[in-house]
């Protein structure tokens, strides 16, 4: 579960092409059944790219608050590591999609978490 997908969102087309050249199934079939990406990205454009490239079902909420970058962004006046606000401000993200990112997807990845919390 790399932060923001690491370099994956930037190289997604390359990976798709490599899979095709190697006669592998499309990446959505090959990888996205068990590969997930978190939202621990410290700026809105990074989250927007992640949401544009990776299916919502493969994105998990994450925050290091208070974490690696505790300062306040002089451009926004907000803490860099307040990753929830990037999800809240994402363009075109429905309430249903937000719920998947915040809790629904992680319950699919870690089903015991949901059972433990319910008990």
Regions found by a protein language model. Give the residues of each.
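H/E-rich (His + Asp/Glu) clusters that bind or coordinate divalent metals
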Residues: 3-119
């Amino acid at each position: 579960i790399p932060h923001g997908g690491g370099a994956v969102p930037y190289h997604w087309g390359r990976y798709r092409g490599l899979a095709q050249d190697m006669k592998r199934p499309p990446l959505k079939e090959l990888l996205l059944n068990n590969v997930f990406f978190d939202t621990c990205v410290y700026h809105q454009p990074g989250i927007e790219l992640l949401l544009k490239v990776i299916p919502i079902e493969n994105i998990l909420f994450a925050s290091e608050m208070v974490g690696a970058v505790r300062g306040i962004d002089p451009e926004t006046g907000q803490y860099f590591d307040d990753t929830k606000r990037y999800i809240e401000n994402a363009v075109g993200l429905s309430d249903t999609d937000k719920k998947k990112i915040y809790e629904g997807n992680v319950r699919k990845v870690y089903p015991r978490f949901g059972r433990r919390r319910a008990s």
